[in-house]
Amino acid sequence: MIDLSAPAIEVAPLLLGATIWRGPVGIRLTEVEAYMGLDDPASHAFRGPTPRARVMFGPPSHIYVYLSYGMHRCVNLVCSPDGEASAVLLRGGQVIAGHDDARRRRGNVAENRLACGPGNMGSALGASLEESGNPVSIIGNGAISALGWRLEPAPEIAEFRQGPRVGISRNIDAPWRWWIPQDPTVSGPRT
C-alpha cells in the first residue's frame, strides 16, 4: 500500500508502475519528481502556503494541479502529513485505459507521447485547475469507478533509476527524479 502521508521523496519511487485514474483514463506512471516544500527552492511551496501552493500543505492524498507556461496543466499528488508541504509531479506514463479520451485531448501524436511530459500527462487525464485540492482514492484489485481521482498501486515495485529533476532552475542537483529505464514514455533522459 502506498502511504501518501510520507514525504514525497519516499513516495515517488513507489509510484512507478502504479496507475493514476481520472474517469475512464488510466495511465501507468513511468516518470515522477518529488518537490519538498519549504526545504526545496524549486517547489511552489518554498515560500509558504500562497494561494497557488496552499493545497501542497495538506492534507495528503489530494491532487495539486497548476498551470505551467500559461497553458499546460500539471498534476501532482500531495504527500506528507497535514501542514507539511511536499508533492510528487507526475511527469510521464503509458495510457492503459481510456485511449479514445486521451487521444481526443492530445490529438494525433504517437502512442508513447500521449502522456509523455507533465503537461501532456495533465492533458491526457483531462485535468483542470478547478480539481486542485480534490481527493485521491487509493484502490486495489483493479476496481475503478467512473468518477474522481484514483491511484492503483503497482503489483510490484518497478526497476527504476534516480537522478536530478529536469526543467527547473533552482535546486537542480537534488536527485529527486525517478523513472523506469528505457521506457519510451519517459520525457527526460531515459538511461
From Swiss-Prot:
Positions of transmembrane segments: none
Biological-process GO terms, alphabetical: base-excision repair
Alphabetic keyword roster: DNA damage, DNA repair, Hydrolase
Known EC number: 3.2.2.-
Cysteine disulfide links: none
Keyword Cell membrane: no
GO molecular function, one term: DNA binding
Pfam families reported in the protein's UniProt record: Pur_DNA_glyco
Protein's UniProt keywords contain Hydrolase: yes
Matches recorded under InterPro entries: Formyl_transferase-like_C_sf, MPG, MPG_sf
Family statement drawn from the similarity comment of this UniProt entry: Belongs to the DNA glycosylase MPG family.
Protein name (database record): Putative 3-methyladenine DNA glycosylase
